């Protein structure tokens, strides 16, 4: 069952300007150390940051709150599997909100997709609730260790 859907579009040039203007103050407020390390080793860091910005916005919308009600930027984090597939991880109040919206007996899976085509970066997040039996039938979710199951 679908619990939430969120999407966001970010302007890479706007994120680049914010990075130039505020530097580490902006990076450290919005992005985890892991997200910063990935962005800084890429040829176009601003595009990587913009995709992660959009993913956090999309995730907050899928959680049904937007960036309010106590959800902090760093409560949502994007990492990549070895295959390059992005994975959304939630902690803090974002995790609490996810647990609140997940029905008893179900686990939540957060699906995220990212893309960019200069000057735009886009993210879409779908939060799905699965029973343990349904999760076992879904090899596309990968190993249980990478799932955001409640």
Swiss-Prot record:
Keywords: Cytoplasm, Fatty acid biosynthesis, Fatty acid metabolism, Lipid biosynthesis, Lipid metabolism, Magnesium, Metal-binding, Transferase
Enzyme nomenclature, EC number: 2.7.8.7
Residues reported to bind Mg(2+): 8, 57
GO terms, molecular function: holo-[acyl-carrier-protein] synthase activity; magnesium ion binding
GO cellular component term of the entry, any: cytoplasm
InterPro entries for the chain: 4-PPantetheinyl_Trfase_dom (IPR008278), 4-PPantetheinyl_Trfase_dom_sf (IPR037143), ACPS (IPR002582), Ppantetheine-prot_Trfase_dom (IPR004568)
Protein family membership: Belongs to the P-Pant transferase superfamily. AcpS family.
Name of the protein in question: Holo-[acyl-carrier-protein] synthase
């Amino acid at each position: 069952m679908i619990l939430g859907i969120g999407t966001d579009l970010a302007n890479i040039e706007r994120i680049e300007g914010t990075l130039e203007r505020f530097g580490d103050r902006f990076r450290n407020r919005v992005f985890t150390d892991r997200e910063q390390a990935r962005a800084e080793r890429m040829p176009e860091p601003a595009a990587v940051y913009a995709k992660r910005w959009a993913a956090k916005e999309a995730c907050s919308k899928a959680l049904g709150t937007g960036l309010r009600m106590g959800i902090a930027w760093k409560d949502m984090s994007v990492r990549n599997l070895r295959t390059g597939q992005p994975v959304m991880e939630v902690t803090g109040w974002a995790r609490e909100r996810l647990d609140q919206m997940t029905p008893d007996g179900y686990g939540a899976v957060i699906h995220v997709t990212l893309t960019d085509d200069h000057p735009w970066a886009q993210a879409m997040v779908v939060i799905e609730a699965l029973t343990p039996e349904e999760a076992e039938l879904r090899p596309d979710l990968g190993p249980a260790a990478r799932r955001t199951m409640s």
